C-alpha cells in the first residue's frame, strides 16, 4: 500500500491538524494489499479553496495510480449528509476501514425514511432512463412483442 502511505503522509503534511479522518470504504476497504481502486473519504475540520489546492497534487497522483478520486468533505458536510446520501452512508457503515484519524463511522445514523426515499429516487431515475432509451431506440412494433 505504498501509494496509500504516500497519500496519507502528503495529506498530513498539507493539512496538518485540519485533517480529521481518512476512511477506506467499499469492496476493497478491508483488503490489506489493495493496489488500486480503493475508495477513500477524506474529512477535514474546515475546507476551502486553499485546502483543496494543497491536496490536489497528492490526490492527482493517487488517481493516476488507478484509484477513484476520494470524496473530500468537511466535518459539517459529514454530519449533514446522512439524509441525502443514505444509501452510501449505510454501505460505508457496513464495510469500512479507518486509515487515519478519528473514527467517524459510529456517528453515522441512517434514518430508514431517508434510505427509502433515496432508494425510490434511484429506482425512478433508472425507470425514466429506461423509458427514454426505449423511446429513442425502438425501430418497429415487432420489437415491442419481445417485451
Regions of interest found by a model, annotated:
Residues 20-28:
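Short gly/ser-rich loop at a beta-strand->alpha-helix junction or flexible surface loop bordering the NTP-binding
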Residues 20, 44-46, 107, 121:
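Residue-identity detector for threonine
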Residues 59-146:
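Conserved NTP/Mg2+-binding pocket subregion across the NTase superfamily
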Residues 27, 44-46, 96, 102:
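Residues immediately flanking
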Residues 1-16, 30-36, 40-85:
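Metal-dependent nucleotidyltransferase catalytic core
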Amino acid at each position: 500500500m505504498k501509494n496509500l502511505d504516500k497519500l496519507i503522509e502528503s495529506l498530513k503534511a498539507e493539512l496538518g491538524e485540519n485533517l480529521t479522518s481518512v476512511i477506506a470504504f467499499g469492496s476493497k476497504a478491508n483488503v490489506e494489499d489493495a493496489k488500486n481502486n480503493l475508495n477513500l473519504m477524506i474529512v477535514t475540520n474546515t475546507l476551502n479553496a486553499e485546502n483543496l489546492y494543497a491536496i490536489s497534487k497528492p490526490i492527482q497522483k493517487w488517481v493516476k495510480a488507478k484509484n477513484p478520486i476520494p470524496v473530500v468533505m468537511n466535518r459539517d458536510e459529514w454530519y449533514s449528509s446522512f439524509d441525502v446520501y443514505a444509501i452510501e452512508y449505510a454501505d460505508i457503515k457496513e464495510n469500512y476501514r479507518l486509515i487515519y484519524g478519528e473514527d467517524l463511522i459510529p456517528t453515522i445514523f441512517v434514518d430508514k425514511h431517508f434510505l427509502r426515499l433515496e432508494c425510490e429516487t434511484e429506482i425512478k431515475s433508472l425507470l425514466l432512463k429506461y423509458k427514454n432509451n426505449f423511446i429513442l431506440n425502438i425501430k418497429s412494433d415487432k420489437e415491442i412483442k419481445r417485451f
